[in-house]
A protein has these predicted regions:
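Glycine-rich phosphate/adenosyl-contacting loop at the front of the ribokinase-like
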Residues: 1-63, 68-72
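Ribokinase/PfkB-type carbohydrate-kinase core domain
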Residues: 1-13, 59, 63, 71-89, ...
Length: 154
């Protein structure tokens, strides 16, 4: 019997607001979207969801805001089977991304890092055992660089 690999993800959790447009607006122009949707994203959380859906035992490490979006996000992680005890709730807003996608599939993204930038190397120390017990740790650069460096060193 093969054991399920433990995968830790240290990274971002954003609420994505995606707008489909016929073209990108010019500076100062207001453009009506062809459609819009809200989804749970962030490069770190996207990695965690993909790994969990592929059959891995996933541990997410990051920060969510003390707001309704953060609570909704935590429920989403649990629904995906992602262990979230390494996700801290902090006194700021949950990260958000505003994504514009044109008909060709090109995009522009504006990110409000919010709670993602509250994660510190000191906070990461409390999750060191999660990383050390993992077969692999996934990182990206939507958290402070010093956090990524600290996680890579564990």
């Amino acid at each position: 019997m093969t054991s399920v690999p433990v995968i830790s993800v240290v990274g971002s959790l954003n609420v994505d607001h995606t707008f489909r447009v016929s073209r990108f607006p010019e500076p100062g122009e207001t453009l009506t979207a062809l459609g819009a949707e809200m989804s749970f994203g962030g490069k770190g959380a996207n990695q965690a969801v993909a790994a969990a859906r592929a059959g891995g035992k996933v541990r997410m490490i990051g920060c969510l805001g003390n707001d309704e979006r953060g609570r909704e996000y935590r429920a989403r992680l649990e629904a995906e089977g992602i262990e979230d005890s390494g996700v801290l709730t902090v006194g700021t807003s949950t990260g958000a991304a505003f994504i514009t996608v044109d008909r060709k599939g090109e995009n522009t993204i504006v990110v409000d890092s919010g709670a993602n930038h509250a994660l510190t190397p000191k906070m990461l120390e409390d999750s060191a055992f999660r990383i050390e017990e993992s077969a692999v740790t996934l990182l990206q650069l939507e958290c402070p660089p010093e956090v990524v460096e600290a996680a890579a060193g564990l």
